Amino acid sequence: MSIQSAIGLAFPASIFLAVLAVGMRVAPADLRYLLSRPSRLFRSLLAMNVLAPVIAVLVCKMFSLHPAVIVALVTLAVAPVGALFSQAMLPLVAPGDAAYARRLFFASIVLSVVLTPLTVELIQLIFGGEVHVNPLPVAEVVVSSVLLPLGIGLAIAQWWPAAMRWNSAIQTVSSIVLGVCSVALLVVVWSRLDLVIQEGTLTAIIMMTLLGLAVGHLLGGPGEDDRTVLAFATVSRHPGVAMVVASLMDQPLAPIGVLLAVIVSEIAVAPYELWRKRLRGTGHTTPGAR
């Protein structure tokens, strides 16, 4: 088995385990929580599922980007929130808003089954010949790698609560597999990164990231912690899902574009993350709505 084939199998496995672990920690009440707060749900979906893809499209139209980078940016914009998102929020917000992050992830996963393929279809119409993908395989990927393990995790939490003692181990294994896959993929494609980097590529990725942070921050509401959560939710998409979806498109270099976009985006969000940590440390943050 080649390294590429092994990575192709390991990425979906890491996604499955990560979402399974999250599903074991949440409950259906988490989705009802957002449904009972329509204003918060509307602002969240507007930022993550409407404005983030719009920003991706506009940025791609502004720059002369390699088609693989276009696919990468729009795929990341429509992918569900990353499985480690709620954990990443723990040092940045109050415990109550960390729960909001978990609920936001739950809603993002459920809604992504419909919204991700729909958005891919709309983007395909916008870009015409630059992006080709059948929305049905995209939906199948989201269902099999995200919705299915989430449902299994919820069932385990409901009918086999003793299994919770393995939750941390499952999450750890998932993180290790994802990390190893990312490093292995980076090693494999390092010599080909220059094939997708054109003039303005890094600027485009940074611009998309900063605009996404700004949109999430502004739509987060009056609570500083809510703003932090929604800002990161708008830009923190699951790289594994994005890579799997990108591999369905007719751009063989698209997974390389996803990896490049994730690396540059992580660097671009660092100043905002540092600011929110300092704000949290000074006690000047305000908790979000409950």
Where are these predicted regions, by residue range?
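Alpha-helical transmembrane segments of multi-pass small-molecule/ion transporters
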Residues: 1-290
